[in-house]
Amino acid sequence: MATKPDDAQLSATAEELEMTKKQDEEHVAFEQISPEEERALVRKLDRVLMPLMAFVYFFQYLDKQSINYASVFGLRKDLRLTGQDFSWVISLFYFGQLCSEYPAAYLMSRLPITLFVGVTIIIWGGVEMTLGATRDFHTLAAARFFLGFAEGAVSPAFIIITSNWYRRREHPIRVATWVSMSGVSQILGALMMYGIGGAKEMVIEKWRAMFLLSGGLTAACGVVFCVMMPRDTTMAWFLNERERKVATLRLAVDRGTRDRAEFNSKQMTEALKQPMVWMYFMMALCITLTTPILKFSSLVVNGFGYSPFQTMLVGLPGGAISFVTIWVAALVPRFFPGTRVYTSMGLCLVPLLGSTMLLALPAKGYEWGIVASTWLAACCSSLLSSSAAMMASNVKGNTKKSVAWTESDAPRYTKGCILSIASWVALIVTYAVYGFAIKKENAKRDRLAGEGRYEYMVGGHDGGEQAVQMGVAVDSDLTDVQDKAFRYNL
């Protein structure tokens, strides 16, 4: 005996029919857009969005590196840092960043993300300037903690912003554009410190001037970001009405969503249960565990007999190598689709080699080999770029401690090198498991689509040669788990 459907079932069916109708309408509208029109739109997006994001990331990395430069220009002596003090100063930045992640994730889903990010940029610029006013370990440690807290939201927010404006195939190049500023910042930041270090008759210590200058520039960049960065495709001041519509439809057809100022607790629960989310966590953890070399590289080089000025100059090639590897991570998958995971595994070998060289090379007679090892060991930004692109493309929906690097181990920092080597090996394993998991999930969804279990194609809904991939309404806020027509990018 057939049971009568209840109100909830009828409501769900009506919502499904309405969603299908909206998807079909959006696809018909999008098919009327020529490739030339879409390319012109993307160029327009790039001209406005990429410079804003690139400048912010440049200053974020400069602010992170400033402690590295200051360490060889008298900071440790002036503030009377001893023992593990400097290691704790480095660590507290990451403690602050860790403490900020959950409140930042909540606020990003409740507030307009671009305004939220702009305000945090201004705040962290102000905190960076306070580093120039520190008088001892305690004030420096507190400032570093709050600097990490203020900066914690930027990289996750930039991943979301990228996915809110660009189609999945466009993510690697755009992520590489702003992440590659880390290499540029490494070069220009060292030259800036070299110039400040050579200045005569300064009324304050030179390392204090570095913090004041970089912090002031960061705060100014935050003001520009607040004013110039639009919230989403529907509010882009630099696009006309037609272009805003096309920009929104692109996301719908590509199974994306735009910024929604609301927190979805169900998506949070889903994320905590999804194995791939924990793989992203492992990627971030492994990369983060290796980043102290970025803060200690100047001390490593300086500890092997180089002057502060020589230390700034011999570190420049490290920025260039970082820049090149970031673009390798972006361009190889572009020309050879489906190779992003394998490219990332290969790029892990660069810092793995550097960490191994730093650990194993003799101290005498191999000075340049040790310098080169710091260049290679610090090339973690390419893995950050690649992992960030994976998250931007494959996650839908809206919603440490460094005591291994201790003074007693200087200048080689043996425990830190061993930790880095272990982290890179763990990251390679994580990438391999992740690649296997998404290939398996895609194959499962293809099989279910072939059986008619999930609708995957439209265009008469008959799956013929003229059928095209169905889009999802841009306001649907379906996650990658809920949207069974979604396919993960390998």
Question: Can you name each region flagged by the protein language model?
Answer:
Residues 1-59, 68, 83, 226-261, ...:
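Intracellular terminal tails of multi-pass secondary transporters
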Residues 63, 79-80, 103, 111-112, ...:
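Helix-breaking motifs and short loop linkers at transmembrane-helix boundaries and internal kinks
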Residues 65, 94-102, 152, 187, ...:
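Residue-level signature of mid-helix packing/kink "hotspots" within the transmembrane helices
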Residues 68, 266-330, 388:
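Extracytoplasmic gate region of multi-pass secondary transporters
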Residues 98-138:
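Conserved MFS/SLC helix-loop-helix module at the cytosolic interface between two early adjacent transmembrane helices
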Residues 99-112, 325-339:
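Helix-to-loop junctions at the C-terminal end of transmembrane segments
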Residues 115-129, 342-357:
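Structural signature of the two symmetry-related core transmembrane helices
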Residues 172-204, 212, 217-218, 402-404:
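Glycine-rich segments within core transmembrane alpha-helices of 12-TM secondary carriers
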